[in-house]
């Protein structure tokens, strides 16, 4: 997707603020239009009540906030973020996520985080790519919200296989002991930030690690939640 300074990257109309990248009309258009469970982020009957899945087996986090399903046009921008390290794309996408968070906070009284953490990459993958796309989202979010962020709060201590084609049992085994907590989180309201949440297994493993170490609450914020 071509990004042109001064024009909305999606509709090509002039921007009131050229550094925003996405106009307000397109920002509203990319938002999720189906009713989602506030806890797991999957389609549900009521947007303010946990779905049947979460009532039977709740995830280890209290709230999941996403902008959209992993579909164009947002998925194209997320792909560019992941493989180009363009700071203007990161800031524009972080702003979309911030808008969703603020709307969720107004409607449900969502607590503001004390600290946000990114989903870490395995060191070899981080070295090959040169950056962690989740870090690029965390930086502006922490600045705007006035909360702490440190890319080393959680580290990935071993490589893991791709999750998409694994069963739930194998996903859990694949991620077991893959992460380590490096900073204290006792009593803190924590947020895990990722670009895309697909099965939820990775953020679940990190959420459980935070809760075992005394975090007061855990939320998950992502650009795309695969439906």
Curated annotation (Swiss-Prot):
SUPFAM superfamilies: PRTase-like. Coiled coil: none annotated. InterPro entries: ComF/GntX_DNA_util-trans, Competence_ComF, PRibTrfase_dom, PRTase-like. Signal peptide: none annotated. It comes from the Bacteria. Could be involved in gluconate metabolism. Belongs to the ComF/GntX family. This is DNA utilization protein YhgH. The lineage of its organism: Bacteria, Pseudomonadati, Pseudomonadota, Gammaproteobacteria, Enterobacterales.
